[in-house]
A protein has these predicted regions:
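Metal-dependent phosphoester/phosphodiester hydrolase catalytic core
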Residues: 1-157
């Protein structure tokens, strides 16, 4: 229910104020766990699952209403890019650092929110300029396996 929280009141207040005050073109919300997901139904430790559904909805709404905000997640054992169907919030999962630790999601189980799905190891890199941001997902040898470009929103958007 609404009383369940991962962030707590003090962190919520800080996050809301920081996002409001920021004049950065791009705002990276880096989370140890998914905000958009999807995640396995058996998990109950993050904002993409039913256990924290109320706070997850609130967080997705806050981030999606903040120009230039998106999520990078580090604790799923697969690489992905998902877009929340309700809010349009983008989330990028960097996956495990090694192929040996990949798993927990079936490679063929690509859901509608998945823009990219790869059950393997690697890392992410992000290049940011004043007008665009490029996120790249790499395999363990450093080869780019996925790239996504986000352009800065024009004033009034």
């Amino acid at each position: 229910g609404p009383e369940k929280t991962i962030l707590g009141g003090e962190q919520w207040a800080w996050l809301e104020q920081t996002l409001k005050d920021s004049d950065a073109t791009f705002k990276l919300y880096i989370s140890p766990t998914p905000v958009v997901g999807p995640d396995r139904k058996t998990k109950n430790d993050n904002h993409s699952n039913a256990t924290y559904a109320h706070e997850g909805r609130r967080l997705r709404e806050l981030l999606s209403s903040t120009r230039g905000a998106f999520v990078i997640n580090g604790d799923r054992h697969w690489q992905y890019h998902s877009i929340d169907a309700t809010t349009g919030l983008n989330e990028f999962g960097c996956g495990p650092a090694s192929d040996a630790h990949a798993g927990g999601w079936k490679p063929g189980n690509r859901l509608p929110e998945h823009q990219f799905l790869r059950v393997a190891g690697g890392f992410m890199s992000v290049q940011i300029s004043a007008t665009k941001m490029t996120l790249q997902t790499h395999d363990v040898s450093g080869q780019v396996v996925y790239e996504h470009l986000i352009e800065a929103a024009a004033d009034g958007e």
